């Protein structure tokens, strides 16, 4: 329940005491840190990957925090600073973020969540924070003044902050604006009272912040022994995120407790994908409808009240004030008023309606615990037993094990709603309790596919119904509101086609498939494009050059592919100009063979001509090689790049940012700059033979420290379509050891 400003101030005072106790516990525990440090050994291999071996799980968590801080200390501390709502105070950026963190009491609620965790996992979170602090204390004089020691509450607050932005999102606000119009500004008729400090519908993320990317997600598949040369399952996964998200690899070993190799993101205290000697899994983003926006009818007789179940209820207001650093370095305050109903915080408001947001995501405080428990499981039954606890609020899970099982599980903390045909994707009626949910679906009620006859499962962020073309999951057996996505996009279509196209795969076949630069979109529309160009009477020089470039292009975005730059420019402008660009739209009866063709040949010709002129002007030729324009760049390394957005139907997903010279870069635009780019970065392939074999690649290296050789030592492998072996067994680690030490 929202509080008045006075009560909020009181809660802040109470929290300060709680935070003081948390910090005091670290101070009192300082004498124990050296003991934990002596209980853990970090062995860095020749790619800088830490293999953390500890006597206890608590010591292992301490070592994980320390090793992460060695590689990404500033990034971790900046994330936690933002989650505290203090970004603007120190940097002058992120004011909207800080307002939202204060609105949602992020630090206070995270401290409470920490106390609610099971005792053992609470110790692990605190130990991870202690490991980060150990590094900070050792390097205090070398770190900026804004770097602060952290608490276990900070670790949880970072996760919660991400969920807050998902729930109170600019994307939702924009969709409501499209449907209901831009709301009145303060002082205009219909605006709420007491808005001199602003109002909640102004909020969201900073204008400079990136919107949620439609390509965010991953590729994943698992092959059963019936579809592999070795007769054993193979698991492949590669997430797609911005390269500044900083995937990070490690192995955590506590004899008799855990021995897991995998990846996570900087600032996260557990590994979220990978394998142990028994099993492995990877995740891809799904689209569960975990959040509802309730349209509340405002009471015309009573300002700032709404009608619910026939009664008038007040909207409660909360004034949020943050500190922000001005350009001249001076501190200033920023104040904004937000509103809340009994159904949730008001994300948007019009003269007649207020829109309250309610979600399962924000309070999923056992998220990290869920992944940690999964990493300790030894077989399918144990894995499913952990999943049934429903600790992880989202994600498709693609699983394989040494016993020969493969499993796809569409996972979510999904509300149990009235399945009466209501479209829950944006706003739902909020005038009664009819659509207000209380309970969640059990995991056993969600879509899954275990050991299909086809011998494979795949997910490239597609709806669960298309996990296998030969073993479809029937959507009619599940509530209609489970999955927001309806269509099968081109990226999962090419995955299905490639998997279906080979009877059996070796591990080398799987590696080659991962790095294919084939573009499915080109195969679907290029025949129509060439036909339209060749039908032009008295063709211009641009059309002739376009025909030659498109006709000879290999339909790939390999570094040496000529014509791909031209085609991309053509498609981007054509599809932006034509609302329905395909001659045959996507058809659920032909989910992996549509869409196809071009709906408007005249527009296609016009946009191709303009694309020829554009590529000539910018690059000198319509047939410039893809790798002459697209670069993988880190420090002094500058290599031809390949890959493109998955929206073109690519399995090799890489997106680039433009530098000042017109080149497109994934990596660093200038030396020592933060990474840019998006898509393939971490790739893992696991074959469940005895002994287990695994390979991976981390495009931008294990460390963001520019002076570290491990900040760029894998980009050449990545550009060359190679994976490096994962050293999982003790003998292999020792044979490839760079250094060994205690924190």
Each model region followed by its residue ranges:
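Hydrophobic alpha-helical segments
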Residues: 392-502, 574
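Boundary at the C-terminal end of the N-terminal hydrophobic targeting segment
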Residues: 27-29
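Substrate-recognition/specificity elements adjacent to catalytic centers across diverse enzyme folds
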Residues: 31-246, 255-257, 262-264, 270, ...
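Bacterial N-terminal signal peptides that target proteins for export
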Residues: 1-13
């Amino acid at each position: 329940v929202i509080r008045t400003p006075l009560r909020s101030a009181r809660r802040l005072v109470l929290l300060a005491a709680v935070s003081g106790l948390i910090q005091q516990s670290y101070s009192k525990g300082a004498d124990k840190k050296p003991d934990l440090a002596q209980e853990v050994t970090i062995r860095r291999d020749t790619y800088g990957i830490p293999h953390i071996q500890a006597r206890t799980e608590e010591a292992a968590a301490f070592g994980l925090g320390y090793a992460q801080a060695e590689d990404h200390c500033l990034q971790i501390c900046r994330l936690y600073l933002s989650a505290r709502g203090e970004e603007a105070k120190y940097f002058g950026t992120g004011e909207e973020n800080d307002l939202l963190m204060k609105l949602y009491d992020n630090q206070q609620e995270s401290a409470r969540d920490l106390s609610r965790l099971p005792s053992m996992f609470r110790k692990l979170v605190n130990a991870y924070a202690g490991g980060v602090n150990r590094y900070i204390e050792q390097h205090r004089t070398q770190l900026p003044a804004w770097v602060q020691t952290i608490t276990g509450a900070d670790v949880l607050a970072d996760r919660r902050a991400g969920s807050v932005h998902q729930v109170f999102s600019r994307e939702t606000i924009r969709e409501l604006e499209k449907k209901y119009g831009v709301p009145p500004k303060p002082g205009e008729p219909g605006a709420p009272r007491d808005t001199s400090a602003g109002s909640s519908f102004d909020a969201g993320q900073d204008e400079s912040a990136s919107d949620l990317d439609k390509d965010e997600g991953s590729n994943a598949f698992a092959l059963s022994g019936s579809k592999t040369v070795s007769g054993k399952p193979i698991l492949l996964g590669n997430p797609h995120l911005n390269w500044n998200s900083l995937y990070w690899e490690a192995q955590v070993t506590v004899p008799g407790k855990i021995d897991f190799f995998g990846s996570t993101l900087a600032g996260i205290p557990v590994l979220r994908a990978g394998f142990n000697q028994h099993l492995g899994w990877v995740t891809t983003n799904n689209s569960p409808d975990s959040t509802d926006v309730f349209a509340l009818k405002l009471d015309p007789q009573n300002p700032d009240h709404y009608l619910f179940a026939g009664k008038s209820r007040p909207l409660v207001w909360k004034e949020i004030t943050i500190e922000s650093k001005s350009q001249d370095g001076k501190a200033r305050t920023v104040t904004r008023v937000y509103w809340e109903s009994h159904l949730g915080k008001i994300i948007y408001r019009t003269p007649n309606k207020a829109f309250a947001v309610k979600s399962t995501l924000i309070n999923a405080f056992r998220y990290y615990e869920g992944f940690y428990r999964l990493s300790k499981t030894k077989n399918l039954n144990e894995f499913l037993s952990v999943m049934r606890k429903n600790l992880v609020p989202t994600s498709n899970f693609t699983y394989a094990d040494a016993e020969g099982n493969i499993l796809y599980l569409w996972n979510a903390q999904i509300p149990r709603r009235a399945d009466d045909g209501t479209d829950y994707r944006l706003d739902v009626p909020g005038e009664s309790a009819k659509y207000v949910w209380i309970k969640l679906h059990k995991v056993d009620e969600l879509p899954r596919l275990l050991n299909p006859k086809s011998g494979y499962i795949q997910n490239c962020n597609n709806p669960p119904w298309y996990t296998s073309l030969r073993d479809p999951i029937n959507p009619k057996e599940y509530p209609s509101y489970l999955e927001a996505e309806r269509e099968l996009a081109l990226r999962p279509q090419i995955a299905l086609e490639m998997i279906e196209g080979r009877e059996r795969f070796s591990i080398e076949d799987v590696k080659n498939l991962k790095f294919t630069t084939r573009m499915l979109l080109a195969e679907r529309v290029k025949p129509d494009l060439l036909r339209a160009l060749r039908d032009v009477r008295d063709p211009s020089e641009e059309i002739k050059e376009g025909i030659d470039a498109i006709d000879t292009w290999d339909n790939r975005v390999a570094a040496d592919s000529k014509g791909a730059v031209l085609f991309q420019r053509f498609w981007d402008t054509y599809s932006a100009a034509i609302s329905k660009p395909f001659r045959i739209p996507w058809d659920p009866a032909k989910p992996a063979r549509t869409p196809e063709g071009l709906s408007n040949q005249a527009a296609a010709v016009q946009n191709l001509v303009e694309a020829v002129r554009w590529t000539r002007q910018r690059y000198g030729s319509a047939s410039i090689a893809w790798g002459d324009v697209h670069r993988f760049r880190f420090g002094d390394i500058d290599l031809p790049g390949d890959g493109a957005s998955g929206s073109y139907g690519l399995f090799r997903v890489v997106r680039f940012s433009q530098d000042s010279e017109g080149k497109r870069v994934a990596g660093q635009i200038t030396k020592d700059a933060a990474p840019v780019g998006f898509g393939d970065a971490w790739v893992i392939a696991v074959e469940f033979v005895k002994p287990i074999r695994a390979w991976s690649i981390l495009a931008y290296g294990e460390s963001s420290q520019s002076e570290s050789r491990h900040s760029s030592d894998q980009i050449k492998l990545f550009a060359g379509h190679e994976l490096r072996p994962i050293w999982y067994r003790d003998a292999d680690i020792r044979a490839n050891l760079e250094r060994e030490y205690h924190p």
